[in-house]
């Protein structure tokens, strides 16, 4: 019998914990602050940014939104990043993706100082994750962090398990691989260049999918009893949302699966808020 991962409920619990931590910091005179930089007028980005802004304020944090037109220059946005780097009231900075094509996104991400790099994209923080830095005081990309918290909540043992990660983005795939390997999982990462990807998928104890292809993973691709984590979110022609997994059919074979919507998405934002508080706490130590 398949069990559905309730991302909304887990996110609610995590947000409650975060609100408690924010209140404790405020008693010490510290208000966690997050700044989001939005460039252009992409509708989805505007919605995501607004959701993050509202959630931070609801949890009692300082939330700053910096907006720029699509024709803004790299230098203008870079200057904003440097200003926020030097602002002691801001503990977390992120640049909302995607950016207009004339931007060097990696350069912007690298300009955020490691101590405020809430997305975990700075090479210094990537290196600490890759090396499994024992003090754990470094930010990790928020979606993989949320996925790991889900797996832990549902007591999914990672030690020695065959885990397949589909998609190798810096946002999900690559940090997910490192987090899992740090927990002694045997990880295979698939990309568009992988030959016979169905072979790897069918042998996975845990399948994590983040490729942006609607309902790409079918029931015949999944091992009986596998844990399936669907990171994708896609809008179909009829306006409905779906993931990268054919949920209705795959759930008949999986032992544990995330729905879309209501699975990974809520945990990503909740993890972003929790990590902002982490950065605020670490800044005072």
From Swiss-Prot:
GO terms for biological process: L-histidine biosynthetic process; methionine biosynthetic process; purine nucleotide biosynthetic process; tetrahydrofolate interconversion. NADP(+) binds at residues 167-169, 233. InterPro entries: Aminoacid_DH-like_N_sf (IPR046346), NAD(P)-bd_dom_sf (IPR036291), THF_DH/CycHdrlase (IPR000672), THF_DH/CycHdrlase_cat_dom (IPR020630), THF_DH/CycHdrlase_CS (IPR020867), THF_DH/CycHdrlase_NAD-bd_dom (IPR020631). One of its GO terms (cellular component) is cytosol. It catalyses: (6R)-5,10-methylene-5,6,7,8-tetrahydrofolate + NADP(+) = (6R)-5,10-methenyltetrahydrofolate + NADPH; (6R)-5,10-methenyltetrahydrofolate + H2O = (6R)-10-formyltetrahydrofolate + H(+). CDD domains: NAD_bind_m-THF_DH_Cyclohyd (cd01080). Pathway: One-carbon metabolism; tetrahydrofolate interconversion. Its EC number is 1.5.1.5, 3.5.4.9. GO terms for molecular function: methenyltetrahydrofolate cyclohydrolase activity; methylenetetrahydrofolate dehydrogenase (NADP+) activity. Keywords: Amino-acid biosynthesis, Histidine biosynthesis, Hydrolase, Methionine biosynthesis, Multifunctional enzyme, NADP, One-carbon metabolism, Oxidoreductase, Purine biosynthesis. The keyword Hydrolase applies. Homodimer. Belongs to the tetrahydrofolate dehydrogenase/cyclohydrolase family. This is Bifunctional protein FolD. The gene is folD.
